[in-house]
């Protein structure tokens, strides 16, 4: 049994729009209902990273990509593209297996990612933790 899902072309299109066109600050990616494909779920244009993270369900896996803006130690505005692997403890085992098996495949398709964040709950991902990763 192959537990790795294929990646829908719309995911790549939305990712390219994010990093090249700056159309949104973030995207959320999920599995299709049959777990055979990774599909685009939503774009995010809100104010804060915390608002973005709050869009992730507490009981199901998601992937995300976020264009994080920050100031470096010389007060220059910088951006880092974060790939987020969200796999809450409450997620069904089958979902976790497919999520884990597919993670590297999707990460490799999204060229230009600066950093990866793996989280199972909100204590493992916050604006302050992401800012720390930017240093």
Swiss-Prot record:
Record flagged with keyword Cytoplasm: yes
Regions that span the bilayer: none
Main subcellular location: cytoplasm
Domain ADF-H, chain residue ranges per copy: 3-135
SUPFAM superfamilies: Actin depolymerizing proteins (SSF55753)
Keywords: Actin-binding, Cytoplasm, Cytoskeleton
GO process annotations (BP): actin filament depolymerization; actin filament severing
Stored InterPro entries: ADF-H (IPR002108), ADF-H/Gelsolin-like_dom_sf (IPR029006), ADF/Cofilin (IPR017904)
Cellular compartment(s): Cytoplasm, Cytoskeleton
A Pfam family per the record: Cofilin_ADF
Molecular function terms from GO: actin filament binding
Role summary: Controls actin polymerization and depolymerization.
Family: Belongs to the actin-binding proteins ADF family.
Descriptive protein name: Cofilin-4
Biological source species: Dictyostelium discoideum
This protein's encoding gene: cofE
């Amino acid at each position: 049994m192959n537990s790795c899902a294929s990646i829908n072309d719309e995911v790549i299109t939305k990712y390219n729009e994010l990093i090249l066109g700056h159309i949104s600050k973030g995207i959320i990616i999920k599995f299709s209902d049959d777990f055979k494909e990774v599909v685009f779920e939503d774009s995010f244009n809100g104010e804060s990273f915390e608002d973005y993270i709050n869009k992730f369900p507490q009981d199901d896996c998601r992937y995300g990509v976020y264009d994080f803006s920050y100031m470096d130690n010389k007060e220059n505005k910088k951006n880092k593209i974060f790939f987020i692997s969200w796999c809450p403890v409450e997620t069904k085992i089958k979902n976790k297996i497919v999520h884990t098996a597919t993670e590297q495949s999707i990460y490799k398709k999204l060229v230009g990612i600066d950093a990866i964040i793996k989280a199972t709950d909100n204590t493992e991902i916050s604006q302050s933790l992401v800012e720390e990763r930017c240093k």
